[in-house]
Amino acid sequence: MAKNLRAKIPAADTLIVRDINEDAMKRFANEAQEAARSNGAGANEGKVEFAKNAREVAEKSTVMVTSLPESQHVIDVYHSILKHGALPSLELERLFIDTSTIDPTTSKDIANAIHTTQTGRFVDAPVSGGVVGARAGTLSFMFGASSQSEELLERIRGVLALMGKTAWHLGEPGAGVSGKLANNYILALNNIATAEAMNLGVRWGLEPKALADMINSSTGRCWPSEVNNPVPGVVETAPASRGYEGGFGVSLMHKDLRLALAAAEQSGTPLALGAQAREVYKDVEEKHRGKDFSVVYKWLTEQSG
C-alpha cells in the first residue's frame, strides 16, 4: 500500500513512514527513490522520510494511515499519539485511517477518543484483496465514518483510491470493521469447504484441475476455489503452488474468525458453523504456522492418511 501511496501522491509531497522493522523502511525508501528517478523526478520530489514513532508521523501529516496485526497494537499506537496532548494545528482536519482488521468495539472507542479530543477524524477502513491486490493497487476497502459531511466522505475515498480500486462506505464508525469481519467469516468457511470438496474429489479419483474448472463454472464457485485454490498446481499463482508460502496467513484468518465470533456473541447473533471452523483453524495454525490459510487442504490430507 505504501508503494502505491508514494507513486500516486503529488511528487512534491513527502511520505512519512514508521515501521518496527527498520530494514523494511530503508528498503522501501530505496525502492521509492529509484522509482522516482526512473520517472524523471527532481531532487526534492518523491521523498520518503522516516519517523521515530507514531506521534511524530501524526505531527507531520495531514493524513495518517495505520495497518497493524491486532487490536492491542492499534490501541497502543493511538494512545501514544493522544497521551502527549494536542497536535500542531492544520488548515485541514487530520485524517486517521486505520486499515487493520480489529474488533468493532475497540475501533469505536478509538474513534471516540480521537473525536472528543478534537485531534482529527478517525476512519476504520479494513482492506480486502491480499498481497496481490496491495501490489497491484486493486484492493477493496470497506470504511466506517460519519456520514454528516459528503465532503469528508469524498476526501476519504480520494485517499483510499491511492491504494485500491473500490471503497464502500458502510456507515458510522465501526461499520467498516464489522463489514470486514462478516466478509472474512464467509471466507473462512468457504476455504474449509473448498479444501474438503477438493480432497473429496481427489480421493474419488478426479483430476484436481478438471474438478476445479467444473466448480468454477458452477454454483460452487468462490474465491478459494478460483483464485486461491488449495490444491498444489491447480492455480499457478496460488500459495498452494509454492508450498503455501506468502498469501494470507492461517494465523490471521484464525484471528479474524475469533473476532467475528466474539462480535457475534456480543450482539447475540447465532453462528451455526463458527465454533467448528474456529477449532479447525486453531489446529491448522498449530501444525502449519506461517503458511497461507489454504494450507487447510494439506491438513485435511494429513487427517485422511
Feature locations, PLM:
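Beta-loop-alpha module in the N-terminal Rossmann-like domain of NAD(P)-dependent dehydrogenases
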Residues: K52, V63-I81, S100-K108
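Helical "substrate-binding/catalytic lid" subdomain
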Residues: A175-V296, L300-Q303
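Hydrophobic beta-strand scaffold residues
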Residues: F50, R121-V123, P208, L271
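Rossmann-fold dinucleotide-binding core
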Residues: T101-Y185
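NAD(P)+-binding Rossmann beta1-loop-alpha1 motif at the extreme N-terminus of oxidoreductases
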Residues: M1-V63, S67, L87-S89, R94-L95, ...
